[in-house]
Amino acid sequence: MGVIEFLLALAQDMILAAIPAVGFAMVFNVPVQALRWCALLGSIGHGSRMILMTSGLNIEWSTFMASMLVGTIGIQWSRWYLAHPKVFTVAAVIPMFPGISAYTAMISAVKISQLGYSEPLMITLLTNFLTASSIVGALSVDLSIPGLWLYRKRPRV
């Protein structure tokens, strides 16, 4: 993949990630002034995950690092705009949720219950379930870690 193709794919990924970020921000009743920042943060998070995945990291670690970046930027923006960090961060990480792997795991579980046990279906179920669980765990933990680091009152040592 050439540089131009990569940059076009990255721009497309970031633009398409901004749409669900704004949509969920509207569902969560985020103030209108913060909608553009939710879109930008969702784009930054999804774009950084794509860059990390393109550089060779797997989706779990890429999501871990991208959501850490989203949490850190969200805390900084919350100080600038005098809002709670979750105003920016929760809607921004929604585009990184593992819909396809969770859906594939669910379909595999339904097929196992209908057709009976088979090893390929069980492998598909476990692989996709563990991938989805790891991604959701990374997203939930990494939204809280920057707050614990940056708002800590006592010394770290």
Swiss-Prot record:
Tell me how this protein sits in the membrane: Multi-pass membrane protein
- Subunit organization: The transporter is composed of YjjB and YjjP.
Instruction: Give the protein's function.
Output: Involved in succinate export with YjjP. Both proteins are required for export.
State the family named in the UniProt similarity comment for this chain: Belongs to the ThrE exporter (TC 2.A.79) family.
The protein's superkingdom reads: Bacteria
What is an example of a Pfam family matching this protein? ThrE_2
Q: What is this protein called?
A: Probable succinate transporter subunit YjjB
HAMAP family in the record, alphabetically?
YjjB (MF_01191)
**Protein localization:** Cell inner membrane
Q: What is the lineage of its organism?
A: Bacteria, Pseudomonadati, Pseudomonadota, Gammaproteobacteria, Enterobacterales
